Amino acid sequence: MGAAVVTALPSVDARAAASPSVDLQPYASYWYPDSLPSGTPGPGITWRSLKEWRAEDDVDLAFNTASVPLARRFAPVPVNRTARRGQARIQALVSFEHTAGNPSQGAATADYYALSHWAYLDELVFWGGSAGEGLILAPNAPVVDAAHRNGVPVLGTVFLPPTAWGGDLRWTRDLVRRDALGQFPLAAKLVEVATAYGFDGWFVNAETDGGDAALGADMLAFVRELKRRGAAAGLRITWYDAMAVDGSVGWQGALNGRNQDFFRGADAMFVDFRWSPASLRASGELAERLGRDRYELWAGVDVEAHGWDSSVDWDAIVPRDRAHVVSYGLYRPEWTRGHLPEGRTPGQFHAADDRFWTGRSLDPSQPDTDGWRAPATVVADRSTVDRLPFATSFNTGHGLRWYERGRVASGAEWNHLGLQDRLPGRRWVVRSAGRRPAVSFDFDDAWRGGSSLLVDGDFDAPATVELYATRLPLSPSTVVELTHRADEGAVTVELAVALREPTRPGDPVPYTYVPAGRLRAGRAGWTTASLRLNGLAGTARSLGVRLTAKGRARWRLGALAVRESGATAPAAPARLRVTGSASGAEGTSLRFAWRRAPGPVRHYELHRVLPGGSRRFLGGTCGNAFFVPALKPEGGERSARFEIRAVDELYSASAPAFTVHSW
């Protein structure tokens, strides 16, 4: 049966509205520089020219625009004696989906690379681009919002592929074509895109061979102009070690005379995987002679195929017995999801991801000495928890269900990284004189969102679980709330608060403990303990919990909040409306938009009001537009009622704005 399409507002263009096969699902934007391939694009692919892009004509702009500003970060005293501050940094190149397949606002599956170890990252590249889909890929809003909440900048990708992978030199020439004034229109366009969408710059990878010295000179001038224009907008540019200054492609595996001008023209350079200990040592020295920071060089570490079993000469990059040589870039760490079998669960993914980022010990205070040098053992973690209010429900940005106040508000799987909370950076530091309990994100139950924090073990001594490095000001009116539950056994719970940091890296955090109650399985379900920190003044430097039990116990933490008393609900959004609809065999897809609420808002949540008056969660976003697929009438209704609420940092919800859609 063919699809019928109705548009409510001109945010879906007339051509799309007239098409009987229109798909209203918005995706992250991708383009060719200008000229398009010959032939016909494959299913689900739209060929576009960046040269022709204009923000005012972009019907998906509201869906792809990030809303969270880049947070400031601080580096606490390292949790071990191997991680360092002020030396090597880590970049990650992540393909969340193929170029044309990145939904703008999450999707109805929990099977997603929900990156969450932001504490160790300094730059995320939203990796993509292919000859058959498009060469320039802008990151989607959920990824940018999650990264920014944790202080990590995100770059889009400009990928000019090798001819063996379908590359065509005309696309390189399109990119660096000058206008009548000798300037580069597409450099300006790339800056315009990043500024409009709210991300932080571009990773430029020119690998199409066959160029000459003139093309090399044009590319260098293009990169310089891109950096100059980008710097004025607060953007950064990373160059990939491929094209040389003479226009040829020759991966150097080093910073040298063939590519140093590109490094000087950009903010950083990714050194191709062909590096050696000698080439990295020479690269760092050359960077410093050029007046640059050696840690602006990312040595490529390819983990796409083997993950933590990858063979890496770590001492060439981050030796343990002397200063780090350069920084490094992890190529395709989403292996932690991809290597798992079909049917993988969110819990299995996070177990693998923790193993990758923390190490085999699953405790960064106990760094491993095996062949995999996990990031937690190399670089000091960073945190953005430095102001009130602060709250978390340990929501990882995907789940099997959606919970509100401990009850299921939607039984559907989902993912949306923009809804991800700031999560514990040190996973999982547990200090005990006895047996160590296991700590994990659990998806079988939650207080809010899709997950909670679960501590499970056979206790023979108190165990302190370190949760957050903080810089939170304390006053007599400061309140800390723990929403928690005992699933098995009886557990005595204490809030752990530190007013100072350890003197040396690797030393235990000097906590003070505040009683938070004793819970017994099967008694009261979820319980919220509100604690005033009487006698504790100054700045909270770390937060955790201490658990005491005898024998087997399972304790679940659903939420943690630190606030001043007297919090109020946020103002409501307005003008919720349907901006596009498309009906087909699987139901009706709707595009929604609304006017943002005045004042601070963490995100917005969209619900459907069912005929009986109950509400079903449809999704959430930090922006002001959302897409919902496959809706159907329920209970004989002739129209469906929807409501949008603003949610603040403490998860207080505003009054709703409503709209109705007739079937």
Residue ranges: model-predicted function:
Residues 626-660:
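Beta-strand-rich modules
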Residues 586-601:
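Conserved aromatic anchor
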